[in-house]
Amino acid sequence: MNIDVVHLLEQNPILLIFVVLAIGLAFGKIRFGKLQLGNSIGVLITSLVMGHLGFSFNAEALTIGFMLFIYCVGIEAGPNFFGIFFRDGKHYFILSMTVLVSAVGLTYFCSHYMGLDFGLSAGMMAGALTATPVLVGAQDALNSGLATIPRNMDFSLVLENLSVGYAMAYLVGLISMIMFAKLLPKLQKQNLSDSAQQIAQERGLGNSSQRKVYLPIIRAYRVGPELIDWTDGKNLRELGIYRQTGCYIERIRRNGILAHPDGDAILQEGDEIALVGFPDSHARLDPSFRNGKEVFDRNLLDLRIVEEEIVVKSDAIAGKRLSDLNLSEFGCFLNRVVRAQIEMPMDLDIVLAKGDVLQVSGEKSRVHGLAEKIGFISIHSQMADLLAFCSFFILGIMFGLVTMTFGQVSFSLGNAVGLLLSGITLGFLRANHPTFGYVPQGALNMVKDLGLMFFMVGIGLSAGGKIFEHLSQVGPQIIGLAFIVSVVPVVLAYLVGAYVLKMNSALLFGAIIGARTCAPAMDVVNEYAKSTIPALGYAGTYAIANILMTLAGTILIILS
């Protein structure tokens, strides 16, 4: 049986989409040293080549892709978006605005000076900043009529310019950002590792990049005379066993009666005590504990140790430092802190925000007691609240259709901004009401990534027909301008952060990468800093930058 592959793909558009996706995703995994192309650029290049070979698809049919992508970006940003001004929040906002304003300004003036075709500049800026939301915002402005297409062009040609500009500039933006992270500290005679250690010393951090996470274990001992001498008649609160060793006494059996002790309890000879703590904490126990006989008793040791993810919700907790939680009072152990899907260093001085996820372990009732105080335990259900997901999606589209009039000027926000706002609202409500709008993180990631890939396939197949013609005509100009737009804003942001805001270098570099939404460069900075301290800065700017980049794409295409 003979199979005409070309005819098969031409007659089966769904098959064509997934063939392009499969090839593009495989292509995106290619590495050049430590540099990986990534899914977005792999799928875009593949779809451009397939488009050049004559395969086509109605790009408008795949606009659902960018809608889902930008909606999911809003949901992820929602829990932390309104808390962006806590502590260093104003610094992160200033850095994000520095990158945004300088990039838009440079792109606008340079593209007009160079006479670039309509759409090329927005695509170039999206690639130079490795910021797909710029591309999404620009296309939505075209779809909604916010941007006016020149008379000598049509929508397909503008879409072609967007995708070609993005494809040519993306690698320039990625490579230049990585080189910035490597070279600028050396040129400024700074050591990111030293800067990270400085923050660690100031805030009482450990080396979270090398930290291992264990569940607490339980050991039981019979109180002997040596331990009684050591306690010297002090109660448990005065002894401060947790502060000294990291263990706490969960149960006491006295005269055959089991009890949960409070801080006023005083140990007596013959008591049997169950201690909970990490293995290394048990090793730090005073020898007086171990001099008594270790007890192996089911009733005494029968404690249910759990590990839960607690989402910060309480207004009384948001805005406070991690150290203010005083976990020792609850007998709980903190394993990690996650914000905006980025694991944060174990910073006792970090200011908590709504939506932060604390991974906590300990005895079940104690962990649940802590959760009731600060928020709620994250739902481990695999079921998504599709009703809320779809309802807010509809609200976002409806909001984007609302037309506002100022004098003789009328405009609508468009789907991108409308869906961003509805997504942020859903994410914020989810952080405050655990039973509402729940979407498993894995499902959210899949919808977001698949939506972005559909978007890339659509614009690539539509624009691929004249890609090599564009490369020969404006390739050098686009690459040169992309280098300028990629480098100058981050240098300006560095100068503002270092000399005006006087930020720590490790935090500053993480914040700049977050403002550039360049996740691949984050690994480079963490490697150079030998720590995850820069993630504090990255998480501070990433959420706000995603929103601003979408608006930047809309603004730039309108001004072009």
Curated annotation (Swiss-Prot):
Instruction: Give the originating organism.
Output: Vibrio campbellii (strain ATCC BAA-1116)
Sorted alphabetically, which InterPro entries does this protein's record hold? AAE_transporter, RCK_C, RCK_C_sf, Transp_YbjL_put, YidE_YbjL
Which NCBIfam families does the protein's record reference?
PRK04972.1, YidE_YbjL_dupl
Quote the Gene3D superfamilies the UniProt record gives. Regulator of K+ conductance, C-terminal domain
Q: Name one GO biological process term.
A: potassium ion transport
Q: Where are the disulfide bridges? A: none
- One of the Pfam families matching this protein, by short name: TrkA_C
Keyword set includes Ribosomal protein: no
List, alphabetically, the GO terms of the cellular component aspect. plasma membrane
This protein is called Putative transport protein VIBHAR_02636
